[in-house]
A protein has these predicted regions:
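Condensing-enzyme catalytic core mediating Claisen C-C bond formation in acyl metabolism
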Residues: 1-35, 44
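A short beta-alpha structural unit
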Residues: 43-52, 79-87
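Structural signature of cysteine-dependent C-C bond-forming condensing enzymes
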Residues: 1, 26-40, 61-82, 90-144, ...
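Generic hydrophobic alpha-helical membrane-span motif
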Residues: 54, 151-152
Length: 157
């Protein structure tokens, strides 16, 4: 079920993310706060993850700023590594991937992950899916012009 939603628009640049990740951070904080995620919860994050240097560093920074230490224990992947960027369909497809990871306990990998960037130092589930018991799934979607959205899913009761 959808437990939380956040959205912002930082309007920093048409294609580049705001370097301090304020908009993305605030969208994640809104969604996590609305969902009431406890600090000890096991998280999966389906990152926007375009595999571009600016986006990946900025999104990593946003995870750290919004989740604190929880970012370092979260399992994070980019399903774009398997599907490509589907533009308008991306948010819906990645929401489905997030829900399936939560339901089935299988976190999709970030395929083609070869040379980690030192600024991207979280667990990006490289190259192979991982079985994991997760409590919440978070999906981030970022758009041109600084549009930032985040959904939090929990297991249906």
């Amino acid at each position: 079920e959808i437990l939380g939603y956040g959205n912002t628009n930082d309007a920093y640049h048409m294609t580049a993310p705001q370097p301090e990740a304020e908009g993305i951070t605030n969208a994640i904080k809104q969604a996590v706060s609305e969902a009431g995620i406890p600090s000890d919860a096991k998280l999966y994050i389906n990152a926007h993850g375009t595999s571009t240097p600016l986006n990946d560093k900025t999104e990593t920074l946003a995870f750290k700023k919004s989740l604190g230490e929880q970012a370092h224990t979260a399992l994070i992947s980019s399903t774009k590594s398997m599907t490509g960027h589907m533009l308008g369909a991306t948010g819906a497809v990645e929401a489905i991937a997030s829900i399936l990871a939560l339901k089935n306990g299988i976190v999709p990998p970030t395929i083609g992950y070869k040379e980690p960037d030192p600024d991207c130092d979280l667990d990006y589930v490289p190259n192979k899916a991982r079985h994991a018991d997760i409590d919440y799934a978070i999906s981030t979607s970022l758009g041109f012009g600084g549009h930032n959205a985040c959904l939090v899913f929990g297991k249906a009761e």
